[in-house]
């Protein structure tokens, strides 16, 4: 007969918390367990925290596009515009599972930045000074930006293949940094865990989501 091993029941204490970072203390934990537990938690946070990103674009009036297509009157090609859009910080409230469509409609000469993006009421651009492209002379542009919610790094081939839309490889992860250190005592340990996001999601929610994910995977009876 195998007897149940005595164990601690840890408690989480929030030490610091602001709009894009959180530091918590988790303890008490068994000796030599904190490092393994922290690494698992770190992997879950990086891989399974969802974020919002631009996955592709469409130039209205042009039916066939590819990554190296030139945009009439625009200094950058499609690939360069998409690369600039990868740095867009998008915050969404009350996601209704409808397609995320943003638009840019401008006439040149003009330097287009993220503040020029027209968004639905439930979407906010946090970095509104991000450079996107330059319109030359009297050219006009009418872009539709396609966004999506996802986790981790996703290749463009996942989103499909349409002649009128160019998709790009996308990193949905809103996590900038995760670190930890262990306080060791005679009979137990404490784990100090730190998370920093890009500002598009609440770090407290990130922590709760990671523990919920972990609970779903290990709460197995047999």
Curated annotation (Swiss-Prot):
The keyword Nucleotidyltransferase applies. Keywords: DNA-directed RNA polymerase, Mitochondrion, Nucleotidyltransferase, Transcription, Transferase. It catalyses: RNA(n) + a ribonucleoside 5'-triphosphate = RNA(n+1) + diphosphate. SMART domains: RPOLD. Pfam families: RNA_pol_A_bac, RNA_pol_L. It comes from the Eukaryota. It is found in: Mitochondrion. Its EC number is 2.7.7.6. It comes from Reclinomonas americana. SUPFAM superfamilies: Insert subdomain of RNA polymerase alpha subunit, RBP11-like subunits of RNA polymerase. It is an enzyme of class 2 (transferase). GO terms for cellular component: DNA-directed RNA polymerase complex; mitochondrion; plastid. Gene3D superfamilies: DNA-directed RNA polymerase, insert domain, RNA polymerase, RBP11-like subunit. GO terms for molecular function: DNA-directed RNA polymerase activity; protein dimerization activity. Belongs to the RNA polymerase alpha chain family. DNA-dependent RNA polymerase catalyzes the transcription of DNA into RNA using the four ribonucleoside triphosphates as substrates. This is DNA-directed RNA polymerase subunit alpha, mitochondrial. GO terms for biological process: DNA-templated transcription.
């Amino acid at each position: 007969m195998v007897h149940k091993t005595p164990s601690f029941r840890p408690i989480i204490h929030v030490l610091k918390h602001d709009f894009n970072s959180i530091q918590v203390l988790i303890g008490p934990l068994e000796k030599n367990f904190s490092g393994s537990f922290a690494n698992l938690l770190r992997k879950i946070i990086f891989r399974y925290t969802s974020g919002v990103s631009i996955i592709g674009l469409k130039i209205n009036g042009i039916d066939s596009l590819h990554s190296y297509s030139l945009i009439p009157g625009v200094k950058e090609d499609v690939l360069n515009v998409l690369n600039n859009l990868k740095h867009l910080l998008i915050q969404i409230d009350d996601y209704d599972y409808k397609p995320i469509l943003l638009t840019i409609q401008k006439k040149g000469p003009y330097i287009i930045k993220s503040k020029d993006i027209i968004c639905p009421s439930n979407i906010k651009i946090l970095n509104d000074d991000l450079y996107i492209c330059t319109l030359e002379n009297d050219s006009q542009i009418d872009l539709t930006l396609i966004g999506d919610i996802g986790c981790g790094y996703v290749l463009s081939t996942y989103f499909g293949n349409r002649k009128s839309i160019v998709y790009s490889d996308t990193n949905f992860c809103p996590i900038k940094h995760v670190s930890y250190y262990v306080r060791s005592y005679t009979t137990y340990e404490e784990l100090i865990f730190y998370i920093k996001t890009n500002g598009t999601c609440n770090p407290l929610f990130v922590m709760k989501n990671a523990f919920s994910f972990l609970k779903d995977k290990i709460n197995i009876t047999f």
